Design a protein with these regions (language model features):
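Conserved, structured core segments of small domains
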Residues: 1-97
Length: 97
């Protein structure tokens, strides 16, 4: 299950959460190394954009709680499809629908 997650950190000053933010990157690197995250990009200013590839909603929920524990944030979550999935869907016989 693919999800695009965009974080918007809580309002404290960046200097107040600097150490927590430093801890985020090793945590995220572990997710990249294990294939749980496919990509991560820091947003200009603060926040990050991550593509997670997880086996369940519960796994995503657990990851977001760990993330928010390290860097308190709000998350926008967008479910995604693999490109080949949408191509297969579009090529299905429309009469079958």
């Amino acid at each position: 299950m693919l999800f695009l997650v965009i974080s918007t950190p809580a309002p404290p000053r960046p200097s107040e959460v600097r150490e927590h933010r430093k801890n985020f990157w090793p945590w995220m690197q572990d997710k990249l190394d294990r294939g749980i995250a496919r990509s991560v990009y820091p947003r200009t200013g603060r926040g990050a954009v991550v593509t997670f590839d997880v086996d369940s909603h519960e796994t995503l929920h657990r990851l977001l709680n760990q993330w928010a524990d390290a860097v308190p944030a709000e998350f926008a979550i967008y479910p995604l499809m693999e490109p080949e999935s949408i191509i297969a869907f579009l090529n299905e016989d429309s009469a079958a629908a």
